[in-house]
Amino acid sequence: MTQRSCSRRHFLAGFAGGLLLPALARAADDAAKAPVEADPAVVERVQRADAIRFPRESFQTEIVVRNYSNGVEGDARTFRVLSRGNDNTIVLTLEPATERGQALLMRGRDLWVFMPSVSQPVRLSLAQRLTGQVANGDLARANFAGDYTPALAGKETIDGTPALVLDLAAVDRGVTYARVRYWIAEADNRPLKAEFYALSGRLLKVARYEDFRELAGRVRPTRLVMEDALKQGEVSVLTYENMNVRDLPERMFTREYLRRLQ
């Protein structure tokens, strides 16, 4: 075999390898990005837990958020939440009086804040802090079934209640948390506890669903305790009041409509 033919073979082999390796890398990357098929039975349980936390119909509720530091109560805020389905929400600030008139508008996963002193709405992320341990998405979007792919991770007992432990993986980076560890009652899907994680895998906060009472036609948690996992003693307590199912027209959930409220 001549030196020229050997060189040509080496060139062709290198050229083919240069084409093949990127193609294989792309295929592996596409496989990694492919959505994981969730067990329909597990998805249904998350949907039922969502429906226990909030009505599936349009509704209105008021939420009082009290922030604590090492057991000492700090500031408190009151919000009115109007929600139409899973994708349209308005969060109005009622108290303190100095912030009255501020409003959050969520459509899908797009979120804007409206402030009386600013002429144009400002785009926000669901993960940004609203107050204390509460992120914007904790009030504006609570659709675990739509935002996360669930998987059964095991079973545990929470305060004497047999519970399923679910791992919820974010469907994309636009949701509030990258991952949620979620405990729901095995018997009736009541939400019991949740751990919220950052994209890095760091535990951000721990939440407990408490004080189940009848609200808007069924028994729901009326108290949510959120503890900072990074800074001990920092706690926010959310109390849900005056929850009512009501008709909310879609025209309410627009930037133009909220501008008229300013």
Predicted region positions:
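Solvent-exposed coil/turn segments that connect beta secondary-structure elements
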Residues: R66, R84-N86, L94-P96, R109, ...
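Gly/Pro-enriched, hydrophobic low-complexity segments
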Residues: Q120-R123, N136, A140-N143, T161-E256
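Boundary at the C-terminal end of the N-terminal hydrophobic targeting segment
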Residues: A25-A27
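Short amphipathic beta-strand and strand-loop transition segments with alternating hydrophobic
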Residues: A151-T157, E210-F212
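N-terminal low-complexity, Pro/Thr/Ser-rich intrinsically disordered segments
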Residues: K33-A41
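N-terminal mature ectodomain segment of secretory-pathway/periplasmic proteins
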Residues: V42-S117
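Surface-exposed, polar helix/loop patches in the mature regions of secreted/periplasmic/lumenal proteins
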Residues: M106-G146
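N-terminal secretory signal peptides and thylakoid transit peptides that target proteins
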Residues: T2-G18
